[in-house]
């Protein structure tokens, strides 16, 4: 593949990927009011909310909470509900009806849901991002949301069913987005709009519970079910909720995740050799996001890539920001690419020898007693695997599990220190022994030399997905990278990047057989003599 970050084997080992990165339905009746075009800052609105419910100190003192509710639909009792929250970012809701239960939960690692029918499923994409975002916000009553690398901006002032309200959008660079409504009159939170999960919620009848004001009426508009009214029966604080109640349900039988990961790792050399026989199209999208979560700039590059044995793939730029290269620039690009092929042909014996040396070195290390690749060995040493389970993903059976640092683990070096801060979830095809999807993020900030050399903020994240072709070969489909980094004394910045791969085409990867045609042709077969 063209770069280390595009290599399926490296993408499998989320620890190594992040080490590499270090180095290199809407709310009803929302009409806009005739209020002034300027609004209070998001921080001020949130501070006023915290004062209204009892103060920041009292809110932070609530380490966990359990509330019990009665569910009504059109004034008829339908069931009961339980909502559980635990700092720093865990949330579980359970609604029990006569015909079953609806359960959903989120932690910083993963989010999952179990409906009235079907098995539990691990959420992905915008659904998962929204669920994780809400868990972080609600578990701490919005206190110190910035420390979790969450952004906030005031969108507008609307006339809601509960009166004038400021609409504040909270977002993460990984795609989480929620809109909270705060009453202009009382400063209390009166609504949440979740477009990703097609849900809107209204909060009413605030009354004291312990040291805080809590809503005693909750109206939830779930897509396709109508409006459910929940009435608070009781709430308790700091009961010492176990973190395990937020974990996904595990499989009934024991699943050996360690053995499965070792098989996946050993399978990679053969898989990479097959992948290196394909050309493909790569689309890179880079976004500049400001401190309020607004995309200020987006650039898109589309290229064709041609793998070279034992060497980085040759990349041929096709377009930028949707515009094909001019004839003059295309000619220069073709000349540059042809020169790269010629150099690869000239160096192919040297490249082959280097590849053999690397292979021999790996064999030597394995003969000394370590049967694992270095990356997977560190990963297995540092991490434990939570709730291994069976799920359907991409219309195939998969084994899914969360991962986090082992309790009490003491890192011995910088790589282990970084891996120990990782959390996430992995989907594996148990038949083909391939990673189908991987999500990893930093639960804590990471610094080198006390932050003088490099500093990564919490929430730095990577997700990747592979897809299976009809001939059984697995290919990367996309990778998303989001992080805020500071490098030495040169400042830093935010990286928000998506790489998508498509149009895989098989051909012989012999350097001497390459001949590049015009940029308009996308058939690699036509580019050979």
Where are these regions (language model features)?
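Signal peptide processing junction and immediate N-terminal pro/mature segment
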Residues: 24-32
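Structured extracytoplasmic
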Residues: 31-164, 174-176, 240-241, 249-422, ...
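Extended, hydrophobic interaction surfaces within ordered domains
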Residues: 117-120, 196-248
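Beta-strand-dense domains in secreted/periplasmic systems and polymorphic toxin scaffolds
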Residues: 93, 192, 216-220, 438, ...
């Amino acid at each position: 593949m063209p770069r280390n970050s595009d290599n399926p084997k490296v993408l499998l080992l989320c620890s190594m990927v992040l080490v590499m990165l270090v180095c290199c339905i809407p709310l009803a009746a929302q009409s806009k009011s005739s209020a002034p075009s300027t609004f209070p800052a998001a921080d001020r609105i949130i501070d006023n909310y915290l004062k209204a419910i009892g103060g920041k100190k009292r809110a932070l003192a609530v380490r966990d909470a359990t509330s019990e509710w009665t569910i009504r639909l059109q004034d008829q009792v339908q069931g009961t509900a339980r909502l559980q929250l635990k700092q720093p970012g865990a949330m579980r809701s359970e609604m029990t009806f006569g015909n079953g239960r609806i359960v959903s939960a989120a932690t910083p690692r993963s989010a999952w849901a179990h409906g009235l029918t079907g098995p539990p499923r691990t959420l992905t994409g915008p659904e998962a991002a929204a669920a994780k975002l809400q868990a972080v916000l609600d578990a701490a009553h919005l206190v110190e949301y910035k420390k979790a690398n969450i952004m906030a901006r005031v969108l507008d002032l609307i006339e809601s069913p509960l009166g004038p309200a400021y609409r504040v959008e909270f977002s993460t660079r990984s795609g989480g987005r929620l809109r909270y409504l705060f009453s202009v009159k009382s400063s209390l939170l009166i609504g949440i709009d979740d477009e990703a999960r097609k849900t809107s919620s209204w909060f009413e009848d605030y009354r004291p519970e312990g040291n805080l004001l809590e809503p005693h009426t909750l109206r939830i508009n779930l897509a396709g079910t109508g409006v459910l009214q929940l009435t608070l029966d009781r709430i308790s604080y700091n009961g010492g909720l176990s973190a395990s109640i937020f974990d996904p349900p595990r499989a009934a039988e024991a699943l050996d995740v360690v053995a499965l990961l070792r098989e996946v790792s050993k399978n990679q050399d053969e898989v990479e050799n097959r992948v290196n026989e394909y050309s493909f199209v790569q689309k890179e999208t880079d976004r500049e996001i400001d401190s309020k979560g607004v995309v200020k700039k987006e650039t898109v590059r589309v290229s064709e890539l041609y793998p070279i044995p034992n060497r980085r793939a040759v990349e041929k730029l096709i377009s930028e920001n949707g515009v094909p290269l001019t004839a003059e620039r295309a000619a220069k690009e073709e000349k540059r690419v042809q020169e790269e092929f010629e150099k690869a042909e000239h160096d192919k014996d040297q490249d082959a020898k280097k590849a053999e040396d690397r292979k021999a070195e790996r064999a030597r290390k394995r003969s000394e007693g370590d049967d694992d690749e270095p990356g997977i060995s560190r990963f297995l040493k540092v991490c434990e695997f939570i709730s291994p389970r069976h799920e359907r993903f991409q219309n195939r059976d998969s084994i899914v599990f969360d991962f986090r640092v082992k309790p009490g683990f003491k890192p011995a070096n910088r790589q282990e220190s970084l891996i120990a801060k990782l959390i996430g979830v992995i989907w594996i095809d148990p038949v083909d022994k391939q990673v189908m999807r991987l999500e990893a993020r930093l639960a804590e900030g990471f610094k080198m030399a006390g932050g003088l050399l490099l500093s990564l903020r919490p929430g730095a994240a990577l997700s990747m997905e592979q897809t299976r072709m009809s001939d059984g070969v697995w290919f990367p489909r996309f990778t998303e990278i989001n992080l805020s980094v500071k490098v030495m004394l040169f400042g830093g910045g935010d990286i928000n990047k998506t790489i998508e791969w498509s149009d895989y085409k098989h051909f012989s990867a012999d350097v001497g057989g390459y001949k590049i045609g015009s940029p308009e042709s996308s058939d690699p077969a036509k580019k050979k003599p």
